[in-house]
Swiss-Prot record:
Family: Belongs to the acireductone dioxygenase (ARD) family.
Documented EC number(s): 1.13.11.54, 1.13.11.53
Protein name: Acireductone dioxygenase 3
Cofactor: Fe(2+); Ni(2+)
Organism ancestry: Eukaryota, Metazoa, Ecdysozoa, Nematoda, Chromadorea
Protein purpose: Catalyzes 2 different reactions between oxygen and the acireductone 1,2-dihydroxy-3-keto-5-methylthiopentene (DHK-MTPene) depending upon the metal bound in the active site. Fe-containing acireductone dioxygenase (Fe-ARD) produces formate and 2-keto-4-methylthiobutyrate (KMTB), the alpha-ketoacid precursor of methionine in the methionine recycle pathway. Ni-containing acireductone dioxygenase (Ni-ARD) produces methylthiopropionate, carbon monoxide and formate, and does not lie on the methionine recycle pathway.
Matches recorded under CDD domains: cupin_ARD
Amino acid sequence: MVQIWQMEPYPCGDPRLPHHLFPPKKITPDELSKRTGTLYWKLDTLDQVALAKRLTTLKLEHNFKKEDIFTLDAETTANFDDKIEELFEESSVPFEQARMIIEGSAYYDVEDKNGQWVRIFCEYGDLILIPSNTCFRFTTTPKNFVKMRRFYKEEEGN
């Protein structure tokens, strides 16, 4: 089951740690959608037909024309710490972001309508869709490894 929570307002230290509020404030996928517009699916990766259908539907409904595989690994990524720092910078883009975790795990942080950060723990089989013009950031977990499929609209160009 997916883990989603409201983050502490001023996280300090390693961004790869959970940064829960105390006491933790868990959020459901429905609440995530209402607060941020972000959509979440847990894909059945063992059912290749259902998986292909879900991804085809995603691509058609959201006009994703291209995709790639992105790997972030402390053992093989050059300047890993710099890359983590770069990816954890808040950003907002004018197009939707779709990501599916195919190995490892990562955190996606999405800013809600009230300026509070919501953290999504994404692992194997998780697919998220972050709406356009939504502030977000990304980091690995302390395991320092994630491999994902990224889906793009044609005009994005990476």
